[in-house]
Swiss-Prot record:
Keyword tags: Cytoplasm, Cytoskeleton
Gene3D superfamilies: Hexapeptide repeat proteins (2.160.10.10)
Annotated source species: Nematostella vectensis (Starlet sea anemone)
Organism ancestry: Eukaryota, Metazoa, Cnidaria, Anthozoa, Hexacorallia
GO cellular component: cytoplasm; dynactin complex
Name recorded for this polypeptide: Dynactin subunit 6
Gene symbol of the encoding locus: dctn6
Amino acid sequence: MAAARQTPRKLKIGAGSVVCQEAEIKGEVIIGSKTVVHPKARIIAEAGPIIIGDNNLIEEQVTIINPLQVEENEEVPPERIVMHIGCNNVFEVGSLCEAVKIGDNNILEAKSRVGRQTVLSHGCVIGARCEVTSQETIPENTVIYGQSCNRRVQAERPVPQSLQLDFLTKILPNYHHMKKSSRS
């Protein structure tokens, strides 16, 4: 019961954002304006705050987690790590993101996974069921696709999902309870 009372103080929701009450949000989370968070999405900030930019789409069963990683012999709690997610990103159904830094205009397709050591720059697409867990920065406009997680570079960044965001902003409140915006 105490954890439920602490959540509103640690959660900041930007103007025009739609965050469904059924979404699980724990820890210090800042959600930018015009972002949509579907029901059953999970945003868990254990190791430090998660800062999510504007115009992001976070679909059902997505897990965005800033996990606390404690070594076996470590008695001192590790330093706080801030997770930054840029603007105009799409997290499709069932994707998992642990990356500490994600740029703008990225797409994590259904059931994709981006690990803790990976940095997504801008305009990247992680294909359905593809996993990227290596310690690297994915170059701009990279597409990772297929069963073997092949890579190629696309000519342009993915188009922002502004029409879909507008539609969901109008429709979701008709069918779900919303968390209140902190800034009006």
